[in-house]
Amino acid sequence: GGARGPAPLTLRNARTFRPFEYFVDMYGLPRYNEIDPTAFVAITFTLLFGIMFGDLGQGILVAVIGWAMWHFKQMPIGRILLPCGISSAVFGLVYGSVFGFEHVLDPMYKALFGLEEKPIEVMNSAMATNIILFAVVIGLTLIMLAMMLNIYSGFKQRNYESAVFGPNGIAGLVFYGSLVLGFGCQLLFDVHVLNLPYVLLLIVLPLVVIFFREPLGKLMAGEKDWKPEKWGEFIIQNFFEEFEILLSYVSNTMSFLRVAAFVLVHAGMMMAVFAIAELFGPLGFTIAVIIGNALVMGMEALLVSIQVMRLEFYEMFSRYYVGDGRAFQPLSVSADK
């Protein structure tokens, strides 16, 4: 009806991604000309779930339960659990964990790759450091991908302030990427790139650009009154905003440490299950391992889903997605008239 706000829409996605529209619905539908994040959510959610919940046995079980929930009860959540379970099983292969038994797959690694034992021993302290590093790298990558989506979305909507000059636009990407590159080279390879021109051009300049994003965006869009009305007010407000933006870069990146935490928590919880199980005889051991697996699986599937959803909404959506569109409702004749 008429020109009331943005045009309504229905989400249209490939069959594989369609179950994940559930999360997009929960957050808010895209505006008419905004990108539909379903595919990005589907891929990143499935990957993160698998990394944080890597167990070949439990993963297959989660997938089977998901399939059954969808097949027999038509529960949409089942179609989300199915790919997540498969992803979990794949990472379980990488971690060498089957229902918490950490060395069952060693013969397979030996046969296939000639390794003495599995490549990733999660509970090994040297490995734990690598897992934490890996989690941060995933975070950096996903945050930069979210920024790229925002740049694409901004150009599509002709919102230059957001796409070019904003904290999640080209300026933000250059700033964040340059910091990551600078510190990464320094810490990992001991290569010194953070010299004065690098810092001024790639770190300070983008920050200045972000500070003046409003007038710059208006200028680029060709608006006449691009200057702020009160410079004093503008400077104070943007000073605090800039500070908040810097904090969000740090906190969003650190937030991905939960990925590493859950990899370690999973291994730790299964160790606890086996420690308890070993107190019993053979029959008691079997029962304890089965109950322990069921408990850990149920609890972790829930916790990991919540954590991944948190990462999707707070760490990624907040960078590239508004989600205040409205759903398309086909016209219907109301019966109460």
Predicted segments, located by residue:
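Conserved, carboxylate-rich catalytic/transport cores that coordinate ions
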Residues: 1-337
